[in-house]
């Protein structure tokens, strides 16, 4: 589809190329890499054991980018084909990662039909943001309910260690990271906008303040990657 905005056109072309080259035949899932190599090892996992597994499909983190991409194109173009793509391809594939074997329910780093995999708070935060944005654009209540469900998982990763904050990985609670707390604040505040529930506003403000206090470099105002439980940056 021709579009006056060259960035939107590039985004459309990139998404088309993604599905053309990474799609796993007869599924809604994607490959981890191109050309496909099942021996490829992901470098962004918390578990070395999991990283050594041979996997036919992508992990959640790269797959979830399609949700953000389609949301952005839907908002930018208002083209209903992206709403259909979301409903018929992106979200059915995403549900392959939804883990109901552990509570609270959440999205795991690999498809749930395989052995249990780690669950990352930052991965789920971004999905929660996307579900909230989808609700805002479509008014579909199911999207808001999924966002609320994800928020329950996020809160399960928050405690009083270090005065608050969200861990990075459910299975390895060794650090509290900028990547889970800064967007966690965004997620909470988006939920507040969607629901007008003051509990989300309170949580969003607390996460924002905690992140600035514990992870911001006071010299250059950039943010450190994480703070460990022994307060080491």
Predicted regions and their residues:
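Glycan-recognition and catalytic cores of secretory/periplasmic carbohydrate-active enzymes
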Residues: 2-233
